[in-house]
Amino acid sequence: MSNEEIKNKDEQLQQDAVETEAEVVGTDADIDWNQAADEIDEKEAKIAQLEAALLVSEERVKEQQDSVLRARAEVENMRRRSEQEVDKARKFALSRFAEELLPVIDNLERAIQAADGEVEAIKPLLEGVELTHKTFVDTIAKFGLKEINPHGEVFNPEFHQAMSIQESAEHEPNTVMFVMQKGYELNGRVLRPAMVMVSK
C-alpha cells in the first residue's frame, strides 16, 4: 500500500468516525429533545391544571365574599327591624299608659275650673291642685305627650272631632269656636282628638 492509499484510507476512517460520532450525538440530541418536549408538555399540563384550580378558587372566594356581604346586610336589616319593633312596642306601651292618664288630667282641670278662687278657705287647696296639674302635665310632656288645644284654629279632622257646628258672625267658617275637651298626641300620633265646636 502506498502512502497515498494509506492517507486516503486514514481520511476515510476519520470521516467514518466523524459520521458515526455525529449519528451518536444526533441520537443523543433526539433523546434529549424528546425528553425536554415531554417535560415541557408535563409542565404545561401542570400549569393548565393549576390555572384551572386557581380560577375555581377565585370563584369560591367571590362567592364567599358575596355571601359575607349578604349576611352583613341581613344582620343590619334584622338589627334595624328589631330596633324599630322595640321602639314601636315602647311607644305602644307608653301610649296605652298615657291614654289611661288623660282622664286624670281632665279631672284636675275640671277641679281647677270648678273651684271658686275668691273663697279664702279654698285658695290653698286650689293652689295645690294647680301645682299638681302643672307637675303632672310637665312630667308626661317629657315622654312626648302634647296637648291639642285648637281654640281659634282652622278645623282639622286629623286632630279635632267636631261635636257641633254653629253659625257665627265673629269667626271665619270652619274655625274652632270652643274646645269642649282638649286632645292629646304622643310622639306625633293622636291619642285623643280635641272635641270642638266649629263655626259654619
UniProtKB/Swiss-Prot annotation:
One of the protein's GO biological processes: protein folding
Family annotation (Pfam families): GrpE (PF01025)
Compartment(s) of residence: Cytoplasm
Region Disordered, annotated ranges: 1-30
Entry keyword set: Chaperone, Cytoplasm, Stress response
Residue ranges that the Swiss-Prot or TrEMBL entry lists as coiled coil: none
Gene3D superfamilies linked to this entry: 3.90.20.20, Head domain of nucleotide exchange factor GrpE (2.30.22.10)
Record field: transmembrane: none
An MF annotation (GO) of this entry: adenyl-nucleotide exchange factor activity
Main subcellular location: cytoplasm
Any Gene Ontology CC annotation: cytosol
Biased composition annotated in UniProt, kind: Basic and acidic residues: 1-12
Family: Belongs to the GrpE family.
Function: Participates actively in the response to hyperosmotic and heat shock by preventing the aggregation of stress-denatured proteins, in association with DnaK and GrpE. It is the nucleotide exchange factor for DnaK and may function as a thermosensor. Unfolded proteins bind initially to DnaJ; upon interaction with the DnaJ-bound protein, DnaK hydrolyzes its bound ATP, resulting in the formation of a stable complex. GrpE releases ADP from DnaK; ATP binding to DnaK triggers the release of the substrate protein, thus completing the reaction cycle.
Subunit structure: Homodimer.
Protein name: Protein GrpE
Gene that this polypeptide is encoded by: grpE
